Structure formats: structure tokens, C-alpha cells
């Protein structure tokens, strides 16, 4: 299944998505521009199975991490014309 994962700038650096991932494809990276000092990095999508547990774990009102499956990938990420 073709899918993509996007980390939005609303990430609060809480690590909930990283801990929720059963395949350990997400990681936090240092980022000086954020009050937590870290932010979720783009995952290894070749290992991601699209379970969306990271989305479910995200505590922000606007999901900071989104998994786009199949056709919604290009539309939802604003890549379709």
C-alpha cells in the first residue's frame, strides 16, 4: 500500500507518537527553534505499515502527524493539481 507520513509544525515534541509506533519508525530530533528542544522527524516510510497509531497518540487539537494512505496521499498533502 502506498502511503506517506507528514509531520506538521504543530508538533509539541511530546514523544507520544514515537512511543506509540509498534515498528519504531519515528524518532525525535533536536530542534533549537522549539521550546521542547526536539521535534518528531519524518519516519522511514519504507518500514511504516500505515497503522496510524501515531495519529491516535497525538495530543494536539490539530494532529501534528498524519498518515496518508493511497489516493489521499497527493490530495491531502496538497500535491495534486
UniProtKB/Swiss-Prot annotation:
Pfam families: Fer4_7 (PF12838). [4Fe-4S] cluster 2 binds at residues 21, 48, 51, 54. This is Photosystem I iron-sulfur center. The cyanobacterial PSI reaction center is composed of one copy each of PsaA,B,C,D,E,F,I,J,K,L,M and X, and forms trimeric complexes. Keywords: 4Fe-4S, Electron transport, Iron, Iron-sulfur, Membrane, Metal-binding, Oxidoreductase, Photosynthesis, Photosystem I, Repeat, Thylakoid, Transport. Apoprotein for the two 4Fe-4S centers FA and FB of photosystem I (PSI); essential for photochemical activity. FB is the terminal electron acceptor of PSI, donating electrons to ferredoxin. The C-terminus interacts with PsaA/B/D and helps assemble the protein into the PSI complex. Required for binding of PsaD and PsaE to PSI. PSI is a plastocyanin/cytochrome c6-ferredoxin oxidoreductase, converting photonic excitation into a charge separation, which transfers an electron from the donor P700 chlorophyll pair to the spectroscopically characterized acceptors A0, A1, FX, FA and FB in turn. Gene3D superfamilies: 3.30.70.20. It is an enzyme of class 1 (oxidoreductase). It is a peripheral membrane protein. GO terms for biological process: photosynthetic electron transport in photosystem I. One of its GO terms (cellular component) is photosystem I. Its EC number is 1.97.1.12. SUPFAM superfamilies: 4Fe-4S ferredoxins. It is found in: Cellular thylakoid membrane. Binds 2 [4Fe-4S] clusters. Cluster 2 is most probably the spectroscopically characterized electron acceptor FA and cluster 1 is most probably FB. It comes from Prochlorococcus marinus (strain MIT 9303).
Amino acid at each position: 500500500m502506498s502511503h506517506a507520513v507528514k509531520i506538521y509544525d504543530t508538533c509539541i515534541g511530546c514523544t507520544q507518537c514515537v512511543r506509540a509506533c509498534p515498528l519504531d519508525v519515528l524518532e525525535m530530533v533536536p530542534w533549537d527553534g522549539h521550546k521542547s528542544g526536539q521535534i518528531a522527524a519524518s519516519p522511514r516510510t519504507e518500514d511504516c505499515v500505515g497503522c496510524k497509531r501515531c495519529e491516535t497518540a497525538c495530543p494536539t487539537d490539530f494532529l501534528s502527524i498524519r498518515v496518508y494512505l493511497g489516493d489521499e496521499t497527493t490530495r491531502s498533502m496538497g500535491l495534486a493539481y
